[in-house]
Amino acid sequence: MFGKGGMGNLMKQAQQMQERMQKMQEQLAQMEVVGEAGAGMVKVTMAGSHSVRRIEIDPSLMEDDKEMLEDLVAAAVNDAVRRVEEQNKSKMGELTGGMQLPPGFKMPF
């Protein structure tokens, strides 16, 4: 079915892919993206692991409506999450060489 050395070769390739995925996960965790809201008045810096590293709020917003500020922070966090997901998808696409994965199959993140 696998031919001469086919199964061993397949296992070796799987192990190499696993090692590359581990390295990619480490690189993605170190990556940072910045999500913005309110034309850059609220910025959220997020790691590739989805942890928020920093929130910057323009001082002029401190005088405004608290509810609006909360909405802008939430929007900036959501923008950062979207950017992390795009970056992760792009990097994993590079790793898998554009290999089409079955629907619902998620990489280990």
UniProtKB/Swiss-Prot annotation:
Mostly located where? cytoplasm
Q: Enumerate the subcellular locations listed in this protein's record, separating them with semicolons.
A: Cytoplasm, Nucleoid
| GO terms assigned for molecular function | DNA binding
Against PANTHER family, the record matches this protein to: NUCLEOID-ASSOCIATED PROTEIN YBAB (PTHR33449:SF1)
Gene3D superfamilies associated with the record: Nucleoid-associated protein YbaB-like domain
Superkingdom of this entry's organism? Bacteria
Keyword annotations from UniProtKB, A to Z: Cytoplasm, DNA-binding
HAMAP family the record matches:
DNA_YbaB_EbfC (MF_00274)
SUPFAM superfamilies for the chain: YbaB-like
Function recorded in the entry: Binds to DNA and alters its conformation. May be involved in regulation of gene expression, nucleoid organization and DNA protection.
**Secretion signal: which residues?**
none
User: Can you list the GO cellular component terms from the UniProt entry?
Assistant: bacterial nucleoid; cytosol
The protein, known as: Nucleoid-associated protein AHA_2212
Family per similarity comment: Belongs to the YbaB/EbfC family.
The record ties this protein, via InterPro entries, to: YbaB-like_sf, YbaB/EbfC
Subunit annotation = Homodimer.
- For region Disordered, the annotated ranges are 1-23, 88-109
Which stretches does UniProt call biased (Low complexity)?
11-23
